[in-house]
Amino acid sequence: MSGKKEVKAPKVVEALSAKIPCGPSELVFGVAHIFASFNDTFVHVTDLSSKETIVRVTGGMKVKTDRDESSPYAATMAAQDVALRCKELGVTALHIKLRATGGNGSKTPGPGAQSALRALARSGMRIGRIEDVTPIPTDSTRRKSGHRGRRL
């Protein structure tokens, strides 16, 4: 027995970093999950099964100050970055799933939702279906701060 070990070369695994092969007129769909709260806006693109992330950018990654994270400007910048990366990877069309905080929180999307959607459409991405997936409670837990009770 010699004291030397066999060294195996590491395997290189690339997940969706290669371009998706398709013709020029073919539409390759992804799913854009837009989560717009009043504190931040997330634009997260996955494949159709929503299992594998293609790209995720937030409004906070695009601006310096905390108060601007949820602004329409930050959402627009995030959506433009997402569209650019999607085109590099060969995704040409998106189904949109729009989400607000929901549950005990606000059920209306934040200020960045509409501008993010508009920026995706203007940057050349084809839009398939738009769906609101905000979680709506059927009977929820108690809201914070004695919600609007005892007002005389």
From Swiss-Prot:
Region (Disordered) residue ranges read: 133-152
Name its cellular compartments: Cytoplasm; Nucleus, Nucleolus
**Cellular component GO terms, alphabetical:** cytosolic small ribosomal subunit; extracellular matrix; nucleolus; small-subunit processome
Q: Name one GO molecular function term.
A: RNA binding
The residue ranges flagged as biased composition, category Basic residues, are 143-152
The family database entries (SUPFAM superfamilies) matched by this protein are listed as: Translational machinery components (SSF53137)
Q: Which InterPro entries match?
A: Ribosomal_uS11, Ribosomal_uS11_CS, Ribosomal_uS11_sf
- Keywords assigned by UniProt, alphabetized: Cytoplasm, Nucleus, Ribonucleoprotein, Ribosomal protein
Which GO BP terms, alphabetically? ribosomal small subunit assembly; ribosomal small subunit biogenesis; translation
Pfam families per record? Ribosomal_S11 (PF00411)
- Cited function: Component of the small ribosomal subunit. The ribosome is a large ribonucleoprotein complex responsible for the synthesis of proteins in the cell. Part of the small subunit (SSU) processome, first precursor of the small eukaryotic ribosomal subunit. During the assembly of the SSU processome in the nucleolus, many ribosome biogenesis factors, an RNA chaperone and ribosomal proteins associate with the nascent pre-rRNA and work in concert to generate RNA folding, modifications, rearrangements and cleavage as well as targeted degradation of pre-ribosomal RNA by the RNA exosome.
**What PANTHER family does this protein's entry cite?**
40S RIBOSOMAL PROTEIN S14/30S RIBOSOMAL PROTEIN S11 (PTHR11759)
Self-association and partners = Component of the small ribosomal subunit. Part of the small subunit (SSU) processome, composed of more than 70 proteins and the RNA chaperone small nucleolar RNA (snoRNA) U3.
The record's family statement is:
Belongs to the universal ribosomal protein uS11 family.
* Name used for this protein in its record: Small ribosomal subunit protein uS11
Annotated source species: Dictyostelium discoideum
Q: What is the lineage of its organism?
A: Eukaryota, Amoebozoa, Evosea, Eumycetozoa, Dictyostelia
